[in-house]
Amino acid sequence: MAKKVVTDLDLKNKKVLVRVDFNVPMKDGKITNDNRIVAALPTIEYILEQNGKAILFSHLGKVKTEEDKEGKSLRPVAARLSELLGKEVKFVPTTRGPELEKAVDELKDGEVLLFENTRFEDIDGKKESKNDPELGKYWASLGDVFVNDAFGTAHRAHASNVGIASNLESAAGFLMEKEIKFIGGVVDNPARPLVAILGGAKVSDKIGVIENLLTKADKVLVGGGMTFTFMAAQGQEIGKSLLEADKVELAKGLLEKAGDKLVLPVDAVVSKEFSNDAPFHTVSADSIPADEMGLDIGQATIDLFTKELQGAKTVVWNGPMGVFELSNFAKGTIGVCEAIANLTDATTIIGGGDSAAAAMDLGFADKFTHISTGGGASLEYLEGKELPGVASISDK
């Protein structure tokens, strides 16, 4: 990649600012999933091995008012990171000022500091989220070099990524490098055949991705709630299934443009209610009863998608095939997950979000070449958009 990577920087005795993505789920002040912290370890450990001083920062959730601060402190993250690294992580409960500056000045080579949630700066005028130039300059003044390892926020131009990068020599961390290699590779130079599997509820969320991938992929398999808008566009009866009526014309246009590249489900698991307790059965995709709704793809579609995947050299999957939170309607997502996991000769990529969660919950995480850490960022990358957080990293 043409962007600098952390290994291109001289880190010895340097104060290294690191934008990590520690936006982890919390419940009652406890971290419920530390995947994102674990994902940042290679970059942090490399900086420490090189005798750099690691100054870490991240956002956590949305913070708009003083009340929002409750439960949004990164203090529990510092404690967990300390356990994972096997060394003390100094926590500074502020985002600017003398306390932070003193802690940074006193940091020794090979030591780690984490300062408070960058979005605490959003309470007074959205300084972080609107990329306030003074804030970016201030944070940049705390370090000698900047490493951006937060792919999850790469689609946003914030003070903590773009703002700092415009004031300091910067490089991608190992996680960011991996994301650019795999997600970027799908868009720029995939091994063929490239098969994309897109799920999720709304066509509107995935229009850009479908349009872009129809020009890149050899096949695009569509599942999830958005299939019903496509079926309606073909004149099929979809009962009470999810429909974006204002997107039917658009779906028609996509179907015409796609020809046989776009593959839709041939059956659906339907029920009268959006519930795990209601009776359910499988019907052909063109005969969904008027009083029922499709909540998953059926076995015939799983078999069809499995067949379409055979021989693929690159597979990218984004979005579940049904309401996978309800066990009765999770079989489609599990089936697709298994089909991709069983491909031995392909680069297999999950584009973050719900599909990543599904693969991890099902124990398939190690069967994929790459599971993206960024939901929105992956989607925008797959749409072919330039990501500000990536664009702002120094070129080699």
UniProtKB/Swiss-Prot annotation:
Presence of the UniProt keyword Nucleotide-binding in the record: yes
Matching Pfam families: PGK (PF00162)
Metabolic or biological pathway: Carbohydrate degradation; glycolysis; pyruvate from D-glyceraldehyde 3-phosphate: step 2/5
Subcellular location(s) of the protein: Cytoplasm
GO MF annotation terms: ADP binding; ATP binding; phosphoglycerate kinase activity
Residues at which substrate binds: 21-23, 36, 59-62, 119, 156
Membrane-crossing segments per the record: none
UniProt main location, coarse: cytoplasm
Residue numbers binding ATP: 206, 294, 325, 352-355
InterPro entries registered for this protein in UniProt: Phosphoglycerate_kinase, Phosphoglycerate_kinase_CS, Phosphoglycerate_kinase_N, Phosphoglycerate_kinase_sf
Major enzyme class: transferase
Catalytic activity: (2R)-3-phosphoglycerate + ATP = (2R)-3-phospho-glyceroyl phosphate + ADP
Top-level taxonomic group: Bacteria
Family named by the database record: Belongs to the phosphoglycerate kinase family.
Protein name: Phosphoglycerate kinase
Upper taxonomic lineage: Bacteria, Bacillati, Bacillota, Bacilli, Bacillales
Gene: pgk
